[in-house]
Regions:
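Composition- and surface-driven signal marking solvent-exposed, interaction-prone regions
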Residues: 1-2, 47
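Surface-exposed acidic/polar loop and edge beta-strand patches at domain peripheries
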Residues: 12-154
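Bacterial N-terminal signal peptides
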Residues: 2-10
Length: 154
């Protein structure tokens, strides 16, 4: 399975990529910043495909961040409660960390007491996605992909 997330911001926009942090295994986590001529700015990191911030002007033109999140990468590793992340392989709880489908019972990783929550111990919010900037003549975005192997997390 290769989930993909694509965010496009139109109207004379720009996209930039910069290092944002390092995983404990040394993998680099990047952050993409998308801006448009109206001052709107979206920041998306490759760890968890997290929307780190979304700044938009109010009716007086003042920018304000409208999403919950942290200013530094380390807090996402130690304090995150799914802020801005892609939840999955399944969003919500699966009771007793198991389910049956077409006569087969699947055992999942229990990470919420005896339950499976938001994709398990290593859900989509805990992996580094591959990021690619998109620029289609002024319409910009970032394509994020992650391949989840069959049986990963249960």
């Amino acid at each position: 399975m290769a989930p993909a997330l694509v965010l496009l911001v139109a109207m004379a926009a720009t996209v930039t990529r910069a290092p944002f942090g390092k995983m404990p295994d040394g993998a680099t986590v990047d952050i993409y910043t998308l801006t448009n001529i109206h001052g709107m700015e979206a920041r998306i990191m490759t760890y968890g495909a997290v929307v780190v911030s979304l700044k938009t002007p109010d009716r007086s033109g003042r920018l304000d961040d409208v999403v919950l999140g942290f200013d530094n990468f380390e807090d996402y590793l130690t304090r995150s409660r799914f802020f801005g992340a892609v939840a999955g392989r399944y969003a919500n709880r699966i009771g007793n960390a198991r389910f049956s489908l077409d006569g087969t019972t699947y055992e999942l990783a229990a990470n919420n007491g005896k339950n499976h929550l938001h994709g398990g111990r290593r859900g989509f919010d805990k992996v580094v996605w591959k990021g690619e900037p998109i620029d289609r003549g002024g319409d910009v975005g970032v394509a994020l992909t992650y391949v989840s192997a069959d049986g990963e997390e249960g």
